[in-house]
Structures are given as C-alpha cells and as structure tokens.
C-alpha cells in the first residue's frame, strides 16, 4: 500500500471540513452513526474540525442489535449530541405501498435511502451539511447505495482506503470495540462487508491501489501479491460495473 502520513491526513481533512463549513455559511454537520468504524471516524474528524457542539449524530436502526449500543458509545465517547430514530415503521409503511415484496437487496437500498432522507431533513431544518461516511474502497467498488449512503454534501473519507481508515481511527482515539468489529452495512441480520464483497479489505485495498492509482498491469499485480489473475479481474469487474455510481447521470452528446 501507499505510504500515507496519517497525522498529516488528519490535518488535511479537518482543515478541509472547517473551510467548507465556513464557505457554506452552515451551522454544523449531521452524520449518520451506524456503530461502525467509518461513521465513527468521520464523526471524530468533524468534531476535531468544527467542535463537538456543531456535530449531530443520527442513529437510525432497522434491527435491534448491538450496533445501536456501539453507535451510542461513539457519540457519548466523543461528546456529540445524537438522536435515535427507528426506521422500521418508515420502511414498512413505504413497502406497504409498493404493491410487491422487495427482495433483500432492494429492501436494503430502501433502508439506506430512508436514512438519507432523515439526514437531509435534519440538515435542512438545522441549517447544517450532511457528511458522508463512504471510504475509497467502497467508492471504487460501488459498495454503497446510489442516492442512499452515497449521498452527502462532503465525504471526508472518500480518498482513504478502508485499511487507512483503521489507522486514522486509532490516532483519533475511536473506541477499540469499534475498530475491532467486523465491518457491516447493517442492511440485514448477519451481513458483513467482506462476505458480501467476497474479498478481505486488506487484499482488496492492495489490488485497488495498484489497479486504479498506479494503473499497474494485471500480470504485475499477480506477481507482487502472489494471487490469481482471476482475483484481480474480479476486482477490476467491480470497478468497471459500478462506474455509473461514481458520477452524476449522463446522456448522449449532440
């Protein structure tokens, strides 16, 4: 992986957030707190940038599990205000009007977009900006919901790979329990990122860095990492198929 100066990265991100908030004339940030490392790290960076009093966390569970307690731990350890909103009745009300029963993936996307609506409702009401929590690993592979968790005003982690977020979280003092837990999008019970992606984040990041940033030939990646070409092509496919998720809608030019 690249040799990133994590302390310098923290300063770059916090300066960016402070400047953008001032430019916008907004009163602070609203962040969805899931109980995972990405939202925790984004919240810690935001609080460092603009003060804890200017950061609101929204905890928006669908299932009753330990994620809510982890999310509360993040907010309380950091000292930011937070609200808990159970999205299950909202999602169920929406689904009841569809005329069909959505499959697991569609339901997960509905959950994610419901959270986005709640984040922006609070941000609009409070004259604040929504901070996204997606990292570069998710962004490049399309592992996010379009117009759901991929929607935000600013995304402080968007140029950090997942393995780099872990290192920055340690420096910021994110609780160890959060750093050590298995990454999950929380879209259904028992779901984990790495199971759904079909690859560990550590290997994924090594491949992505070489494939996307260095534009290294596949054969060289195989040689350096000691993996099969099929594994590299699998990641390459994730990047290619998710291109539409990384840009605004486009049409033909005339």
Swiss-Prot record:
This is NH(3)-dependent NAD(+) synthetase. Deamido-NAD(+) binds at residues 113, 146, 153, 244-245. Belongs to the NAD synthetase family. One of its GO terms (cellular component) is cytoplasm. It catalyses: deamido-NAD(+) + NH4(+) + ATP = AMP + diphosphate + NAD(+) + H(+). It comes from the Archaea. HAMAP family: NadE_ammonia_dep. Its EC number is 6.3.1.5. The gene is nadE. Pathway: Cofactor biosynthesis; NAD(+) biosynthesis; NAD(+) from deamido-NAD(+) (ammonia route): step 1/1. One of its GO terms (molecular function) is NAD+ synthase (glutamine-hydrolyzing) activity. InterPro entries: NAD/GMP_synthase, NAD_synthase, NH(3)-dep_NAD(+)_synth, Rossmann-like_a/b/a_fold. Mg(2+) binds at residues 38, 138. It comes from Thermococcus kodakarensis (strain ATCC BAA-918 / JCM 12380 / KOD1). ATP binds at residues 32-39, 133, 162, 184. SUPFAM superfamilies: Adenine nucleotide alpha hydrolases-like (SSF52402). Pfam families: NAD_synthase (PF02540). One of its GO terms (biological process) is NAD biosynthetic process. The keyword NAD applies. Catalyzes the ATP-dependent amidation of deamido-NAD to form NAD. Uses ammonia as a nitrogen source. Homodimer.
């Amino acid at each position: 992986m690249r040799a990133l100066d994590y302390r310098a990265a923290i300063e770059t991100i916090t300066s960016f957030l402070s400047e953008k908030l001032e430019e916008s004339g907004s009163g602070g940030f609203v962040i969805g707190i899931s109980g995972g490392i990405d939202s925790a790290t984004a919240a810690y960076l935001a609080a460092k940038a603009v003060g804890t009093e200017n950061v609101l966390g929204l905890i928006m569970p669908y299932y009753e599990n330990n994620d809510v307690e982890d999310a509360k731990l993040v907010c309380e350890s950091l000292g930011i205000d937070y609200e808990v909103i159970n999205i299950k009745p909202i999602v169920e009300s929406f689904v009841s009007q569809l005329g069909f029963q959505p499959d697991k993936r569609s339901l997960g996307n509905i959950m994610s977009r419901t959270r986005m609506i709640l984040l922006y409702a609070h941000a609009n009401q409070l004259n604040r900006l929504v901070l996204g929590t997606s990292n570069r690993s998710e962004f490049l592979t399309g592992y996010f919901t379009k117009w759901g968790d991929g929607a935000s005003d600013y995304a402080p982690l968007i140029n950090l790979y997942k393995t780099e977020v872990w290192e920055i979280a340690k420096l910021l003092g994110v609780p160890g329990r959060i750093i050590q837990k298995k990454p999950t999008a929380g879209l259904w019970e028992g779901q984990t990122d790495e199971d759904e992606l079909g690859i560990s984040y550590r290997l994924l990041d090594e491949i992505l860095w070489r494939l996307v940033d260095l534009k290294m030939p596949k054969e060289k990646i195989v040689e350096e990492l000691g993996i099969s070409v099929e594994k590299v092509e699998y990641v390459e496919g994730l990047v290619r198929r998710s291109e539409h998720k990384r840009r605004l809608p486009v049409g033909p030019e005339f």
